[in-house]
Amino acid sequence: IDTELSKLAPLPVSEMITYSTLIDGEVKKGEKDKSVVGAPLAMPAGRQVGAHNEKDKYTRVLVTGAAKTLVQKYVDVFKIAKLNLQAIDTESFALIRALIGKDKGAIMILDFGSHRTNLFVVEKGIPFVARSINIGGETVTRRIADQMKINEVDAERTKRDLGIAGNGSVGGLPKILEPIMQPIVNEIRFAFQLYANMELTEIKHVEKIILTGGSSHLPHVPEYLAETINLNVYRGDPWARVVYPKDLTTVLEEIGPRMAVAVGLAMREME
């Protein structure tokens, strides 16, 4: 595994903490989640069962890893805080637990955050494509500030008001957001192409997009993406697998997009 990983890893394998598990065949319950940073790869299986099927020549392995120096920084922070560090996990696995669960389809998670937007194409619970683009909520704030000639504090307040006012309203994507959304649309299409052309994936066609992240509350973003890409787009609900008092529904719906990663991390040992 290390030999194959060395062809893909950005660092020497000796400088990384890695964990691997089989994608095909028997996998212990919850084993695939005990990981740091993930990327599927194909390993020669050593024997060929049925020459008619190219996939039979390989064993698919999910390898996860991170630089030892990065992991040590997190360990040191938790020691200073006098907290017991249980595990280090990736955003992708946390989001899969919180938003996809046991759905075995091909799904894209679009995490529209403050500084960047992350895209993950997930097939049968395994992330096969991970992309990131430096566009996020702060990009929207700066554009509002430039367009309206106001400071960024007021622009941030305007953005939040825009999100609140947009909930349940009719109409299309605000014009101010269109130039920001176009690079994200381009990245989505590129991720779709990467996934479709991967040799060892099975479904090939993404069935839906789940939208999450603190900036996903912006008005009409799901509708705009659905119309532009011709695919079903939903805002993710990280509370769908969580039992909570009904009188908290309004508050949880408001903070849900920002809590998906945290909820997924909390669900790590509950599967």
Pin down the residues of each PLM region.
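Glycine-rich phosphate-binding loop plus the immediately following alpha-helix
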Residues: 69-92, 126-164, 168
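Helical "lid/coupling" subdomains associated with nucleotide-phosphate turnover
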Residues: 145, 170-271
